[in-house]
């Protein structure tokens, strides 16, 4: 193993999942999103759908490194039941079957940006639940391509910026503020 970072991250995620499971009596799902690119979508699918039997969801996007716009994740979180199917020899089930229909909450912090800014912005826009934590860092711009330089390097500069339905630039240099501000100060609490 070249680095233990991945193992430590996985241990942190699993500790959080077990804590949410224990404190909620098995009623809440815990889903951590490391980014809004491939690994983030993999994490979402792995954790969200495996916990479909839960009554609510804690989405943790702290330290989200961004990637792409997270509309897929928000759309999945926002799925509403459209009816039931009755089984001849079993209990009825919701349609669509994949999803957690109960309350949702998202944990955010100042180390989430770009797609990690877009995700809580969309979550709040759709009124999926409260945002808890600290304001995201406010870096919602994007790049398209990396023009090469003569020495074989590359240059990146923002080529996309986000604005809202009022026609105003939004989120960039502002971030997304929580509904409930909670500072994570484990050292101050003697829990480092």
Q: Where would I find each of the regions flagged by the language model?
A:
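Active-site/binding-pocket entry motifs
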Residues: 37, 83, 162-163, 182
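Metal-dependent DNA phosphodiester-chemistry modules and their immediately adjacent helices/loops
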Residues: 18-19, 114, 151-181
């Amino acid at each position: 193993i070249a680095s233990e970072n991945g193992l430590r991250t996985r241990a942190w995620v699993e500790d959080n999942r077990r804590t949410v499971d224990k404190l909620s009596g098995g009623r809440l799902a815990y889903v951590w999103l490391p980014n809004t690119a491939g690994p983030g979508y993999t994490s979402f699918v792995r954790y969200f759908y495996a916990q479909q039997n839960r009554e609510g969801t804690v989405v943790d996007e702290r330290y989200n490194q961004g990637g792409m716009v997270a509309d897929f994740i928000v759309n999945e979180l926002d799925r509403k039941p459209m009816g039931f199917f009755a089984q001849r020899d079993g209990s009825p089930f919701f349609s669509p079957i994949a999803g957690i229909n109960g309350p949702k909450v998202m944990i955010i912090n100042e180390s989430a940006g770009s797609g990690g800014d877009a995700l809580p912005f969309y979550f709040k826009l759709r009124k999926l639940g409260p945002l808890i934590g600290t304001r995201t860092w406010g870096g919602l711009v994007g790049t398209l391509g990396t023009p090469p330089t003569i020495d074989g390097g590359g240059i990146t500069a923002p080529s996309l910026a986000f604005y809202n339905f009022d026609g105003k630039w939004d989120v960039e240099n502002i971030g997304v503020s929580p509904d409930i501000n909670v500072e994570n100060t484990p050292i101050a609490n003697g829990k480092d």
